[in-house]
Regions:
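Conserved NAD(P)H cofactor-binding loop of Rossmann-fold oxidoreductase domains
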Residues: 64-69
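Active-site helix of classical SDR
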Residues: 96, 130
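Rossmann-fold cofactor-recognition segment
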Residues: 27-42
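Residue(s) in the substrate-gating loop at a strand-loop-helix junction
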Residues: 114
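SDR active-site lid
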Residues: 147-208
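Canonical Rossmann dinucleotide-binding motif of NAD(H)/NADP(H)-dependent dehydrogenases/reductases
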Residues: 1-9
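Substrate-binding pocket helix/loop in short-chain dehydrogenase/reductase
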Residues: 72-73, 80-83
Length: 242
């Protein structure tokens, strides 16, 4: 955790209060646990009030909350698709824009997207689209904030061993079956913090295979990339061709 720098206090925002309390013993700073559902507009107003009352000097904002469901478009409830957009896109933008007035030169902003941000991904269509938004938003914001001396970077991991991954597969119904490699979350974050503090990159990508895949999908037609993905998932025909 020393790589994070030195802070007077760490604000940790999530829905589950028990997880927030457990985090207190894992970091070397005083922790303020804040239980909020960021898809609730009222929660964002509460966050705005917290900022206005505390008027903190924010040294680092890490937007890493996310929600995903994998599967055919007709297998994922509309409410879940809209929740992905609300949390992965709308809440991230709100947290960023509410916090930026409290960030000075030298502050850092980290947004979590995904390898799926670089290509269209059948059976992850809404999730991957939200991550493409995060990547584009983060890179353009990085350029805008450069004159202010605020460092902005996206983190684009491949498959990662997390509780999120397990939940995302619950609706998959075998639509997504092939994962070439699962990375440890701590290794992804270690690379991200190195890149954030020691490089000028606007995108951090952990793992040589993931970096090569990003390069490859930039060169190949997206139609071919999607066809390869479908074959990897053992879907040689589209659903309406069955």
């Amino acid at each position: 955790m020393a790589q994070w720098g030195t802070f007077d206090e760490l604000w940790v925002i999530a829905r589950r209060a028990d997880r927030l309390e457990a985090l207190k013993e894992q970091v070397p700073f005083p922790v303020r646990p804040i239980s909020l559902d960021l898809t609730d507009p009222q929660a964002l107003e509460l966050y705005r009030d917290l900022l206005e009352n505390a008027r903190p000097d924010v040294g680092l904002l890490a937007n890493v909350a996310g929600f995903g469901k994998f599967g055919r478009y007709d297998q994922i409830p509309l409410a879940d698709s809209l929740k992905m957009i609300d949390l992965n896109c709308k809440a991230l933008v709100a947290m960023t824009e509410l916090t930026l007035p409290y960030m000075k030169r030298g502050a850092k902003l980290l947004n979590l997207d995904s390898l799926s941000a670089f290509q269209p991904v059948p059976y992850l269509n809404v999730y991957a689209s939200t991550k493409a938004f995060v990547l584009s938003y983060t890179r353009s914001l990085a350029r805008e904030l450069r004159p202010r001396g605020i460092r902005v970077m996206a983190v684009s991991p491949g498959w990662v061993k997390t509780e999120f991954f397990d939940h995302a597969l619950q609706t998959s119904n075998d639509a997504v079956t092939y994962y070439n490699r699962l990375y440890e979350a701590k290794d992804v974050m270690k690379t991200a913090l190195h890149d954030l503090y020691r490089t000028k990159k606007d995108v951090s990508i952990h793992g040589l295979p993931v970096r090569w895949q990003v390069r490859l999908v930039k060169l190949l037609p997206h139609k071919l990339v999607m066809d390869i993905w479908m074959r990897q998932q053992k879907h040689n025909k589209l659903p309406d061709e069955d």
